[in-house]
Design a protein with these regions (language model features):
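Extended, subdomain-level signal for the structured scaffold at the beginning of enzyme domains
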Residues: 3-113, 126-137, 145-195
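Short, thiol/selenol-centered motifs that function as redox-active sites or metal-ligating centers
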Residues: 120-123
């Protein structure tokens, strides 16, 4: 029979962090996953604009205009039952995406079904708004740590290149952790590979 590629849902929006979107997207596509990248009020082929965040000596990250990223699916057509897992990008988009009730619903549906969920950098801002972190260990961009604590989660400070796994949730602080979070996420979805 035909091998059906596992589908992953990726939530992103304008000024999503460039590396935190494109790197996991391409890595999962390379492995054969179908990655449906969606944004509220947008359809497949519509563009979101990425932001490039970095540390250049100021007290917080700098931001530069990144690339145009073409969405691969329609937000309004999302049925969470079709997906093996959810990946939430970081950057500036999580702050406003969490104001869309359907975004919150989507997150809660993945947690209710105990499906793998990954969130990087500012991505956990969506998890805190969805009230799904009670009793869970999670990391994030350090400035999001207080939100995790207030949401009843346990904020874990780790190196930017690391990821934290608690059950079917995997989180990472920033784009140096792209490899770690993507690796743990696909493991949670049952992927096995050998070199």
């Amino acid at each position: 029979g035909i091998l059906m590629a596992k589908k992953v849902l990726m939530l992103a929006g304008d000024f999503t962090e460039d590396y935190e979107t494109m790197v996991p997207f391409q890595a999962m596509e390379m492995l054969g996953y179908q990655v449906d990248v969606v944004c509220p009020d947008k359809k497949a082929g519509d563009i979101i604009r990425t932001a490039i965040h970095d540390f250049e000596g100021e007290q917080t990250y700098s931001e530069k205009r990144g690339h145009n990223f073409a969405l691969t699916a329609d937000f309004d057509a999302v049925n969470t039952a079709d997906y093996a897992g959810l990946f939430i990008t970081g950057g500036r988009s999580p702050e406003y995406l969490r104001l869309t009730p359907r975004v919150i619903e989507i997150v809660q549906e993945f947690f209710a079904a105990n499906k793998p969920v990954a969130a990087i950098c500012h991505g956990p801002q969506i998890l805190t708004a969805a009230n799904v972190l009670k009793g869970k260990k999670a990391t994030a961009y350090p400035a999001v740590g207080p939100d995790i604590t207030l949401a009843g989660g346990e904020y874990v400070a780790v190196d930017a290149s690391e990821a934290v796994v608690d059950g079917n949730l995997v989180t990472a602080p920033a784009w140096p952790g792209d490899s770690a979070i993507t690796r743990e996420f696909i493991k949670l979805m049952g992927a096995k590979w050998e070199l």
